Amino acid sequence: MAAESGFWFKLKHMDRGMLVKKMLSFDNVYVIAVRRIADGKTLPEDKDREFVQITDTRDFWYADPSLFEWKGDTWLFVEAFDRKTLLGGIACCKLCDDPAEDVKKLRVVIKENFHMSFPQVFEWNGGLYMIPETGDDHSLILYRAVDFPDKWERVVRIQTESVLADTAVVKKESGRLTLLTSELSTKRQYFQRYHRMYLTDKGNGRWELTDDEEFLSKQEFSYIARNAGSLYEEGGQIMLPTQESTETVYGVRLNFVRYDENEADIFAQRTGSIGPEDVTVRGFGKGRASGGRLDGVHSYARSRDYEVIDLYYNEFTPLKHFRKIAKKLKY
């Protein structure tokens, strides 16, 4: 049987209230929120302490936060979504004493003519590197910092047959990176499956991206097989946040799993899960089911001192459909 198109599938299966909003030009707007870690208590257990919103601007809203610690400082990297072009770039700022004030210094550091998101920054081979999501370009791109954090150069761009989303670095060796990424289904929206891939420096400017075929043979498409942030350590365990969608709605919940490189089932050791009803953001409250404004929780990052999440709500956007058509015609 032929797969239903995205539009007709959503029309048939989406919650009626949400469907009406979408047809009336409501669109997702993402909110990044941050809080300091207190007494070692973090999500998914600590659901009571309030997060503080990182305010969006007239030109940008922000999503896909990641945290990178460097020389005693904590840097926040995000997707900066341009409301006019409908394309994301990569922005950053340093977190200090007052995150709500710090983020007013967010500035775009990488911008391409295609959509970018999910910036993953890491130290490797004596340098600082970044792999953002560039699935809109059907590529995987490795950048190197020339003047951290403001100037980056491309090291390599590898064309990919599939659209790869939300790539995380799970292992670093001297000449090779092990990546955990998701292939997006061409038949059903929000359906994806995990790939473990190796990005290898072959020398003399040559790079190779290969699949772990044994790992791939054990993966299935699902609504949960997608990263929601970088690996982090908790109590001697390596943890991975993942995002959960539904048939018709993207990024509604987060799952937390213990990551084991020898385990093909990423979700074999799931330790917790949260939705918008479990998180309080100043000015937004909790999820709509709890009387707040939030519709979904989508990403999570943690450092020694901070936790950062992104959530979304629906906002009336009268030019939504016009801008999407204009973007397709332009690109």
Task: Report each predicted region and the residues it spans.
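Carbohydrate-active catalytic/glycan-binding domains of CAZyme proteins
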Residues: 1-331
